[in-house]
Regions:
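Structured mid-to-C-terminal alpha-helical surface segments
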Residues: 1-201
Length: 201
């Protein structure tokens, strides 16, 4: 029903993967949307959306924003969405528990949210950890390992630069992501947020 609705209303190519139980113990549906299927002159651009079967603790009514000025018929649409604070908590928890690797978008998103003045809601972190069927002790242990890898493993920075090149304009990549000083800034900010998260009781 979701696929048919998105395809009919917006003319987008959409696929949905059946839920899989990831190592976080959470059922996750993978939604993939090709944004401009009619543009054969451009590389295929996909938006990947994970829909997880976990509760949102800090929902707020939000108006759907149209950053690109394209009329999608969604003007004025109000949705219940997670607060940015809860999204930041999710990103820090994902940094600790995501299977097999550090996801570069988590690093970028943590920095972006902090640049928007968002504070990590420490009171919410234990509930989010519990939603993922882990303990606070496991969170601290895993996060410590991931934070130490940020500077200890040069491949982490190389992977980050490579992935961000896919999402950001070339000038932004040259002026920020490719600069050693940006990596130092980013890792210090992420380590600082991680240290704050590990103070929970």
């Amino acid at each position: 029903m979701l696929v048919e609705g998105l395809e009919a209303r917006y003319g987008l190519k959409v696929t949905v993967g059946e839920p899989t139980k990831e190592t976080l113990g959470v059922d996750t549906w993978k939604l993939s949307v090709i944004t401009q299927p009619e543009r054969k002159d451009l590389p295929v651009q996909r938006i990947h959306i994970d829909i997880c079967a976990i509760p949102s603790h800090d929902r707020r009514p939000m108006m759907l924003r149209n950053f690109y000025g394209v009329d999608l018929g969604t003007s004025g649409l109000i949705l219940q969405a997670q607060s940015r604070e809860e999204i930041l908590a999710d990103k820090v928890i994902a940094l600790a528990f995501r299977p097999n690797r550090i996801k570069n978008r988590d690093l970028w998103d943590i920095a972006w949210l902090k640049q928007q003045g968002i504070e990590l809601p420490l009171a919410l972190v234990p509930a989010k950890i519990n939603d993922h069927r882990h303990t606070v002790a496991e969170f601290r242990s895993q996060l410590k390992v991931r934070l130490s890898a940020l500077n200890a493993d040069p491949a982490v920075r190389r992977d980050f630069v490579k992935e961000m090149q896919r999402f950001l304009p070339a000038a932004t990549v040259r002026e920020t992501v490719e600069q050693e000083s940006f990596w130092e800034y980013l890792t210090e900010l992420v380590r600082s947020e991680g240290a704050r998260a590990m103070t929970i009781g």
